[in-house]
Amino acid sequence: MKIKKILALAVALTSVFAVAGCGSTGDSSSKVSTVKKVKVEDTQEIEAIPDDAQKTIRWMGTYDLNPNEKKGEDKSVEMTLFNNKGGKVEYTRVTDSEKFDQLASAIMAQQNVPDIFKYEWMAFPAQVLKDMYQPVDDIVNFDDPLWADVKTTADKFVMGGKHYVAPISFTVGTLMMYDQDVIDAEGLDDPYELYQNGEWNWDNWYDMMSEFVSNAPADVERFGINGWFQTQVIQQTGKTMVNYDGEKFTNNINDPDIERAEDLLYQVGKNNLVNGNWLGNAKQALKDGNLLFYCMGTWAMTGNNGPSDADTWRVVPVPSDPNTDEKYMTSDMTAYMWVRGSTAKEAVKCWYECCRMANTDETYKENGKEKFLNANPNWTEDMYQVIVDCSS
């Protein structure tokens, strides 16, 4: 089955469904056990930060890019490379609800201005127009082999002839997690096997949920699905609810394929297959065996939000449209905006390159995989490969 990526920036053109702030719920920041550290070799392909340059960059965000060593966390590959080149990251913590206001206040006051800030959909063009960021062309050469394969994407973030976003990587936006023990107990087909055979589609997903819910004991309420899945289901058609030809927008809501997807979602809702509550994370969603699928980003199913030793949880992509051979995945783009007022040019350049190298070099990607599996010992290699397949 062919897999095509759809950047998360295009989600607005596909659906009006929204999701609560990712990462805001769960206990992934606590109870972390010491994990085995993975050795990461240095690279000669990235220059060290000059001795006379500012070597520390300030990161403003809702999470720390540095590991919490008191909790036994390992460094990311990119942080290891950055430290080896003389760089350090200073963390300024902000809440999800206040991050944009605090960034704007820092820029306006020119006090404690962060050097980098996570790319999100508001960054371009809205926040660029507010003069919150500076172009990256002075520190990123998109003709360089390290950056060449993201140039097309970077060209979508040009204003006034300048690039404002340097894409680091693309990661699957959502996956469906389920409990294999529940699947086996109900005598249902294994979704992962269906996925491997190219048969994981709307039809068997719907049938599976219907059977699971209808077989509930008299005193038990069951649901087929919870989380953020509506947008992704529509995207499996390969169509958008609004078309843009480079000059004008046109309404595409009456496209027959869009209508098929919407009818499917209507049936899923009408037949009470959806638990519409905010359950927070996979651990909460799957704990009692009365929900078949939990659909959310990997943040909600890893770390302390993920499976425990006794769990047999698995993951699959959002089921595909049975009327097409293509598989479309919403892809979240990782990038760091260079904040207006930052003077750490050389250090930010180095950070960008370390991040990009960590996500493109095969050895470093293998290091990253090992770190992930060490931190998530109840994720199997097959589960990790689903992430890779849907992110590539």
Task: Give residue spans per PLM region.
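Short helices/loops that flank or line small-molecule/ion binding pockets
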Residues: 100-113, 130, 183, 206-211, ...
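Glycine-centered hinge/linker elements that transmit conformational signals in sensory
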Residues: 207-210, 244-278
